[in-house]
């Protein structure tokens, strides 16, 4: 079968594609904001259809950006949920099947996201993003396990919940 595009028409298409795609090469990368809140249900924000709660700023960010419509985790605890969100893996595949201390005893005290797991923050940082986290980390409190060791440039928060054991 004979090719229906001649050389001049191919050149025109290539030049057109070049000028259409060129601005994309210089476009600023998008900002990435992830909001993860304990005990916030799927329909508890205006942008997800709640008829009473008013969340205008979050609704605006959702309208101008991307909403997660199918994220869920098979563990009903906060640490495994965070691990799944940050690694893109099931909690049991990255070793985070329960919450670390204070209520889990010595085994849970030592629990942290394995260093071999790559986090979303590490990927974004390697792409030139400045990264930060505010709030409860809950993925380990030992050296090498804190947010600033796992790809976040800045961190303001606590390693566990507000019922942590006193430091001895």
Which residues are covered by each model-predicted region?
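Intrinsic disorder/low-complexity signature
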Residues: 1-3, 23, 28
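Bacterial N-terminal signal peptides
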Residues: 13-23
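Formylglycine-dependent sulfatase
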Residues: 25-168
């Amino acid at each position: 079968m004979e090719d229906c595009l001649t050389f001049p028409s191919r050149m025109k298409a290539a030049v057109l594609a070049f000028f259409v795609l060129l601005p994309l090469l210089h476009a600023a990368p998008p900002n990435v904001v992830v909001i993860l809140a304990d005990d916030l249900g799927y329909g508890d924000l205006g942008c997800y259809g709640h008829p009473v709660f008013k969340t205008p700023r979050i609704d605006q960010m959702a309208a101008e950006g991307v909403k997660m419509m199918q994220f869920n985790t098979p563990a009903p605890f906060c640490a495994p949920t965070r691990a799944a969100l940050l690694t893109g893996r099931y909690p049991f595949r990255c070793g985070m099947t329960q919450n670390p201390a204070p209520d889990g005893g010595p085994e849970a005290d030592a629990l942290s996201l394995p260093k071999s797991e790559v986090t979303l923050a590490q990927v974004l940082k390697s792409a030139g993003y400045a990264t930060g986290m505010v709030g409860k980390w809950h993925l380990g409190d030992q050296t090498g396990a804190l947010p600033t060791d796992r790809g976040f440039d800045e961190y303001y928060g606590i390693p566990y919940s507000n019922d942590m054991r006193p430091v001895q």
